[in-house]
Amino acid sequence: MLLRGIPAAEKILQRLKEEISQSPTSPGLAVVLIGNDPASEVYVGMKVKKATEIGIISKAHKLPSDSTLSSVLKLIERLNQDPSIHGILVQLPLPKHLDSEVILQAISPDKDVDGLHPVNMGKLLLGNFDGLLPCTPAGIIELLNYYEIPLRGRHAAIVGRSNIVGKPLAALMMQKHPQTNCTVTVLHSQSENLPEILKTADIIIAALGAPLFIKETMVAPHAVIVDVGTTRVPADNAKGYTLLGDVDFNNVVTKCAAITPVPGGVGPMTVAMLMSNTWRCYQNFS
């Protein structure tokens, strides 16, 4: 079975659009883009477009790649103080000379639509869902629930330990909550016996950023696989590149119970949860 993200995301977005249309004012989302990374520019454009479609007023703030930390922090502080802005997103990755941790921590936790501020991450770890959940982990759970993939008591293996996906997803999936409550194993590229461990997993989340890393010999026939990876690889086509996931899709798709495609799997869910968090921020302010 293919776990396509678009229908699941559209269901969420349609609900948000209906709720926002009944609001006396519109939520405001500020997206900060630093530099000229082509992929980041595409992603920001997609987010701004989707926000506009459902009634969120969204504006991209573009800064040059040589921007100083001070100038970025000044912009974020201005957005923190702006009552018309309910959510702030800083598009990652940042230019190497900028400290992403310092910048993300400068965002008000109440406007942290990415859910990456230490306050929101801390609430997640403590099992407090009053905070804003990181978009990709939350989107993965919503996607699995949409396709009625049972999670309670299942063994979930997460390959990757980033602050954006791996760590918060592990914290989310292990929570004693009706939608999660998994037994979680966190792995990475240097983990010993990785193939053997993956074969015991009911659910595999691939979030390494290593194209085609997960092979068909690593998965059990009953496994549900969520591929978070999106690596641009040069290709002889109109775009000049193709997107590859962390899973060797063509060989794995016939060896597992269900799998997300790349693109069209996790990506739409991440955007949907970003919009959901923005609406939630607006409601909290109102």
Swiss-Prot record:
Cellular component GO terms held in the UniProt record: cytosol
Single biological process term from Gene Ontology: methionine biosynthetic process
UniProt superkingdom: Bacteria
GO MF entry, a single one: methenyltetrahydrofolate cyclohydrolase activity
Enzyme Commission number, as recorded: 1.5.1.5, 3.5.4.9
Gene3D superfamilies the record matches: Leucine Dehydrogenase, chain A, domain 1 (3.40.50.10860), NAD(P)-binding Rossmann-like Domain (3.40.50.720)
Pathway: One-carbon metabolism; tetrahydrofolate interconversion
Protein name per the record: Bifunctional protein FolD
